[in-house]
């Protein structure tokens, strides 16, 4: 199946998209995609071209994506929070010749800094779904490429260095929507898309999957608590795919009445603290199903089945996924022990754009090496212990920050927590705990240390504790540990770190 075939999965007169006060039936949706395809073809877009999308969530983002895909071109969604220099890097790296935007971007200086002489034609995304008179329809291309043809380039956030573009095929994406079938979405359900569409989690789970089953996608351009809660209530939203920070805010600000139509809540993007999960379930009577995925896997790899979720687990692998847990020699570890989680399936990326060495490293042996440390229980439910790169080695002992963070979250008054490895002359590395507090809360570090000492081995206790007004996050809700560490090291160099 090709990605743009999803636009015809629903009944023609059923509502496919809701974007604030605008509603589009599946028939109107298909017509808008056709209009966009014709506009793009008239502008010069051809098979294999890379077309950037720089936009907040909107119906037009969806029209643009499917219009690009239907021409055999590659969509390149770009994080709208990036600086001009970061945007220019992606344009240069992907070889983007067309950029769909709400407002024209002035990238002249940024492109010059990167010595990029590409001529980029900027197209107004706001009118992309409208029929344009005086242009010829784009030719039918259905038989000229198959589902192994590349569809999209998803750029990683760059938290570990220069962003890499994961290339996903039509098959990668449509196969992943099939893999999600056990989430039970039906045509009568209404799925909220509030996570950014440029991110694979928001796109596949909140757009492609509901379209695959002929359901309704309810679009919000960004998350604000008041509007999100009102939309859930007024539109009768049934399915939520969100990140832990949104789960936490809904618990604090929404009422049970606001959330009465919600049947399914899936958390992804980053690890879900147990306290957030239990507080949410106690208030709304709906269990959060935690899942796991990566941009490189389209993204879903595991998911807790509704009604069978295990707290703290990322669930079993979805159908069609093969997985292993391996040691440093790539040998399987004994059942129940920890090791790197590696996976294989039809949803795994084709590779990184123009990065053959990075592709070989990530897909060595035919398996996607996730960089995550995991274990499995006797029922086949998987648990992410931590990131390999985040693991702290102190006096030869492995410390997994997530284990410490889970306990810090349980201490009264703590709103956010991140444990990060810092240099220690004696031990090699030690943990530093950065945290923020709930409004009006105060805590005693001495009491926090006592609490941790009662529950952890002494070598796991962070050496330092630093309170911040809030912890910086990436666009997908992950705590930006690299940014925290960078700021800490800069302040320390200036003698200002507290």
Which ranges hold each PLM region?
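Conserved AMP-binding/adenylate-forming core of the ANL superfamily
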Residues: 15-45, 49-58, 62-66, 83-88, ...
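Gly/Ser/Thr-rich phosphate-binding loop
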Residues: 237-242, 251-310, 322
């Amino acid at each position: 199946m090709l990605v743009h075939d999803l636009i015809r999965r629903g009944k023609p007169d059923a509502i496919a998209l809701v974007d604030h006060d605008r509603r589009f039936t599946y028939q109107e949706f298909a017509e808008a995609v056709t209009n966009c395809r014709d506009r793009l073809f008239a502008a010069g877009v051809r098979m294999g071209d890379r077309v950037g999308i720089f936009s907040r969530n909107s119906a037009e983002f969806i029209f643009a994506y499917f219009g690009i895909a239907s021409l055999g071109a590659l969509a390149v969604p770009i994080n709208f929070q990036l600086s001009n220099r970061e945007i220019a890097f992606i344009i240069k790296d992907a070889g983007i010749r067309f950029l769909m935007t709400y407002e024209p971007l002035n990238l002249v200086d940024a492109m010059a800094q990167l010595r990029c002489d590409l001529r980029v034609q900027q197209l107004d995304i706001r009118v992309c779904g409208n029929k344009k008179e005086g242009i010829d329809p784009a030719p039918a291309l259905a038989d000229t490429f198959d589902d192994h043809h590349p569809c999209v380039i998803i750029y990683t956030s760059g938290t570990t260095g220069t962003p890499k573009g994961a290339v996903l095929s039509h098959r990668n994406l449509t196969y992943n929507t099939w893999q999600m079938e056990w989430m039970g979405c039906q045509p009568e359900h209404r799925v909220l898309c509030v996570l950014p569409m440029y991110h694979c989690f928001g796109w596949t789970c909140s757009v492609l999957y509901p379209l695959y089953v002929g359901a309704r996608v309810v679009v919000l351009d960004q998350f604000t608590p008041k509007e999100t809660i009102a939309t859930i209530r007024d539109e009768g939203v049934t399915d939520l795919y969100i990140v832990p920070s949104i789960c936490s805010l809904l618990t604090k600000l929404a009422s049970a009445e606001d959330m009465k139509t919600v049947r399914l809540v899936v958390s992804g993007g980053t690890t879900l603290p147990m306290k957030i999960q239990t507080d949410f379930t106690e208030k709304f009577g709906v269990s959060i199903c935690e899942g796991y995925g990566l941009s490189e896997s389209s993204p879903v790899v595991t998911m807790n089945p509704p009604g069978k979720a295990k707290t703290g687990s990322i669930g079993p692998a979805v159908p069609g996924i093969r997985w292993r847990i391996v040691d440093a020699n790539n040998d399987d570890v004994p059942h129940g022990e920890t090791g790197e989680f590696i996976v294989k399936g039809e949803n795994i990326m084709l590779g990184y754009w123009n990065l053959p060495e990075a592709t070989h490293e990530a897909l060595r042996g035919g398996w996607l090496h996730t960089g995550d440390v995991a274990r499995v229980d006797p029922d086949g439910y998987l648990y992410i212990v931590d990131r390999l790169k985040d693991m702290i080695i102190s006096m030869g002992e492995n410390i997994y920050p997530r284990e410490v963070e889970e306990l810090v979250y349980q201490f009264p008054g703590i709103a956010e927590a991140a444990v990060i490895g810092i240099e220690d002359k004696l031990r090699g590395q030690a943990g530093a705990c950065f945290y923020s507090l709930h409004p009006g809360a105060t805590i005693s570090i001495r009491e926090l240390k006592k609490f941790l000492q009662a529950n952890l081995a002494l070598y796991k206790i962070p050496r330092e504790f630093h309170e911040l007004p809030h912890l910086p996050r990436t666009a997908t809700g992950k705590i930006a540990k690299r940014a925290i560490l960078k700021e800490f090291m800069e302040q320390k160099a200036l003698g200002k770190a507290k």
